Amino acid sequence: MAMRIRIDLPQDEIPAQWYNILPDLPEELPPPQDPTGKSLELLKEVLPSKVLELEFAKERYVKIPDEVLERYLQVGRPTPIIRAKRLEEYLGNNIKIYLKMESYTYTGSHKINSALAHVYYAKLDNAKFVTTETGAGQWGSSVALASALFRMKAHIFMVRTSYYAKPYRKYMMQMYGAEVHPSPSDLTEFGRQLLAKDSNHPGSLGIAISDAVEYAHKNGGKYVVGSVVNSDIMFKTIAGMEAKKQMELIGEDPDYIIGVVGGGSNYAALAYPFLGDELRSGKVRRKYIASGSSEVPKMTKGVYKYDYPDTAKLLPMLKMYTIGSDFVPPPVYAGGLRYHGVAPTLSLLISKGIVQARDYSQEESFKWAKLFSELEGYIPAPETSHALPILAEIAEEAKKSGERKTVLVSFSGHGLLDLGNYASVLFKE
């Protein structure tokens, strides 16, 4: 009998709750700071009221609204876990590799998991429209689809570099009915100020956040947060909750849980439901490894301090690993990894040594993406590729120890709309 490669969870077994890590953190999360006295009031105006309430929730588990659960099923949940057998063989059969395939959702990434919740709660507030930022376009396309499914209008502010480098995601958002604007944007006062200084400003996620918040505030919309904050991570934990059930189905318990970090929600969404069990037990056995871009090394070279999550400094300061809210990253193709900070909950766990952080260059990660594509037949997103080098390191560690290890990977998205970016780096086209 052939080895089981794909682990599916029946639709009627989809988890009915999100997981909230706040009650299980090793210490209380440092609260937001508001030096101006205006940022928290702004948040109350631009965030959906239920999202703001859930940001500070004390409950360990939060019921997923039926309307959101129904749409999870509609967009491809539960997603499968796939065993990367040929990659295992290439690495010497020292590790077993299981991929949580968030790329199987209709938008091709993990982002739809929280987009549906945010837009649903904005609709409950009778918002005129929603706004958000996007880098490579995965988050923007997810908000665009979520808005379509809840019959809402969406304005997406896309980092200018990606707006022109990744036109197909822009078209995807437009197909879902969203309006897409390059950021810095001439629709906002902050954007116009930046464009006056540099009409070809490449933009950044921090700037796009500022554009989206300002536009929502001045025009009666609600701002949809794409990462970093606890509520967004909570909404995305549907992936980790599914993965726990799937690993139990095959009698496997991961020794390592790995994934990439832009703002932190992708990795946290998979890892937190597993990590929460260990934090409550008082002993963390597994190794949790988060990877990022060496071109934007916030986890390895950043400082753990209070900083603004957006460039215009409109939002409250958060304690996180950061390389500075004014940082304008190089135009690397993994647009989702270009954010300057790391989610406060994940930052706390990194600072305590519970989660390890590693960075890899674009060139190294893209070479692994090509190898992975040849071996497994599936092309990862540029962001996702930054998790692949970890596997070789784990395989080498397992070889030295003589113990075969099991690795669970967040396969956060596919790269079928990023082939031009791969070609520029790998084939010099």
UniProtKB/Swiss-Prot annotation:
Q: What is its EC number?
A: 4.2.1.20
Among NCBIfam families, the record links this protein to:
PRK12391.1 (NF009057), trpB_rel (TIGR01415)
EC class (word)? lyase
* Record pathway: Amino-acid biosynthesis; L-tryptophan biosynthesis; L-tryptophan from chorismate: step 5/5
The family database entries (Pfam families) matched by this protein are listed as: PALP
Name of the molecule in the record: Tryptophan synthase beta chain 2
Q: Which HAMAP family match?
A: Trp_synth_beta
Assembly and interaction partners = Tetramer of two alpha and two beta chains.
Cofactor needs = pyridoxal 5'-phosphate
Its biological purpose is as follows: The beta subunit is responsible for the synthesis of L-tryptophan from indole and L-serine.
Single GO term (MF): tryptophan synthase activity
The answer to whether the entry has keyword Lyase is yes
User: Which UniProt keyword terms apply here?
Assistant: Amino-acid biosynthesis, Aromatic amino acid biosynthesis, Lyase, Pyridoxal phosphate, Tryptophan biosynthesis
Q: Which residues carry this modification: N6-(pyridoxal phosphate)lysine?
A: 111
- Gene name, Swiss-Prot/TrEMBL: trpB2
Question: Catalytic activity, per the record?
Answer: (1S,2R)-1-C-(indol-3-yl)glycerol 3-phosphate + L-serine = D-glyceraldehyde 3-phosphate + L-tryptophan + H2O
Asked if Amino-acid biosynthesis is a keyword of the record, the answer is yes
| Species, as recorded | Saccharolobus solfataricus (strain ATCC 35092 / DSM 1617 / JCM 11322 / P2) (Sulfolobus solfataricus)
Any one Gene Ontology BP term: L-tryptophan biosynthetic process
Domain of life where this protein originates: Archaea
Family recorded in the similarity comment: Belongs to the TrpB family.
